[in-house]
Structures are given as C-alpha cells and as structure tokens.
C-alpha cells in the first residue's frame, strides 16, 4: 500500500524575468515538510514548475499524491498540452520549441513515478496549503536576494 501525500506548490518572481522562488508544502499522515529554493534570474512559470518537481522528487517511494497548485500554466501543461508536446518531440502546434521543456520533461519523469491527481485552487484566497506554499516561495526569493528570514 502506498502512502497518501498532499503537496501544495507555488512559485513567485519579482520581475518576470527576475529573482524568483518556489515553495512546496508536503503533508503525509499529519506530518508537514517545507521545501523552498530560488534562482537569481528566472520566470514565474519556471518557479511554478520547480515547486512541483521538487515536491515530487522529495518522495522516496511511490505514493498516491494530490498535487495542489494555483498555476493555470502547470494545470494546462499537465492536462492539455503535454501529451501533444511529447508526440511532436517537444514542439508546439506551431512547430516551435516548447518553453521550459527542460522542466516539463523533469516534471513528466517525476509524475510517472507516482499516482498523481492534480487540483487547481485560486491563489491568494485564504487556502491554507496554498498560502503556506506562497510564503515558502517568497522565502526562496528573499534568500536569492540576500535577505535571510528568521
């Protein structure tokens, strides 16, 4: 029997591109784990993807995962676009290279390790897990910019 895990993810960027951060809150059997990180020059979409990738990478064995995001980009990529990108060799319908293909490929690899269901929530509406992930993403931005949080 595999563990059931909820992962709440968020990305943040100060400028787009600019310094960015990602955050993931993992919850399993009432135990929480916080993850965050950042990059000096990135985009909000890359940080949204990184949050999901890092959250899934943290799981050491196959799990039933509910991944909760406020990113329409991540949701549409996973549910609508990725299958066709893969069929076309990571090209769009216009035969252009898929933006962030490196991260989409990493996410695809991680998703295939688990049984993942995806849930979209509207950001900044008081959803506890989403708000925590947002705080973690902003911590990632702050650390990249040289601000340390207590």
Curated annotation (Swiss-Prot):
Reaction(s) catalysed by this chain's protein: Endonucleolytic cleavage to 5'-phosphomonoester
Enzyme's top EC category: hydrolase
Gene, per the UniProt record: rnhA
UniProt cofactor note: Binds 1 Mg(2+) ion per subunit. May bind a second metal ion at a regulatory site, or after substrate binding.
Keywords: Cytoplasm, Endonuclease, Hydrolase, Magnesium, Metal-binding, Nuclease
Alphabetical list of SUPFAM superfamilies matching this protein: Ribonuclease H-like
Chief location: cytoplasm
Similarity section: Belongs to the RNase H family.
GO cellular component: cytoplasm
HAMAP family: RNase_H (MF_00042)
InterPro entries associated with the record: RNase_H (IPR050092), RNaseH-like_sf (IPR012337), RNaseH_domain (IPR002156), RNaseH_sf (IPR036397), RNaseHI (IPR022892)
Biological process per Gene Ontology, one example term: DNA replication, removal of RNA primer
Primary role: Endonuclease that specifically degrades the RNA of RNA-DNA hybrids.
Subunit structure and binding partners: Monomer.
Cofactors demanded by this protein: Mg(2+)
UniProt-listed Enzyme Commission number(s): 3.1.26.4
Residues that bind Mg(2+) 1: 10, 48, 70
Organism in which the protein naturally occurs: Pseudomonas fluorescens (strain ATCC BAA-477 / NRRL B-23932 / Pf-5)
Name of the featured protein: Ribonuclease H
Subcellular location: Cytoplasm
RNase H type-1 domain: residues covered: 1-142
Highest taxon in the source lineage: Bacteria
Residues bound to Mg(2+) 2: 10, 134
Listed NCBIfam families: PRK00203.1
GO-annotated molecular function: magnesium ion binding; nucleic acid binding; RNA-DNA hybrid ribonuclease activity
Membrane-spanning intervals of the chain: none
């Amino acid at each position: 029997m595999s563990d059931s895990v909820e992962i709440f993810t968020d990305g943040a960027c100060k400028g787009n591109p600019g310094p960015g951060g990602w955050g993931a809150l993992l919850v399993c059997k009432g135990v929480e784990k916080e993850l965050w990180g950042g990059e000096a020059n990135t985009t909000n979409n890359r940080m949204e993807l990184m949050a999901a990738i890092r959250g899934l990478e943290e799981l050491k064995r196959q799990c039933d995962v509910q991944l909760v995001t406020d990113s329409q980009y991540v949701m549409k990529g996973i549910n609508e676009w990725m299958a066709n990108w893969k069929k076309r060799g990571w090209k769009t319908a216009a035969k252009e290279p898929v933006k962030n293909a490196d991260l989409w490929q990493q996410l695809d690899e991680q998703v295939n390790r688990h049984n993942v269901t995806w849930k979209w929530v509207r950001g900044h509406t008081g959803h506890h897990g989403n708000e925590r992930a947002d705080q973690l993403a902003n911590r990632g931005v702050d650390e990249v910019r040289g601000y340390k949080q207590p």
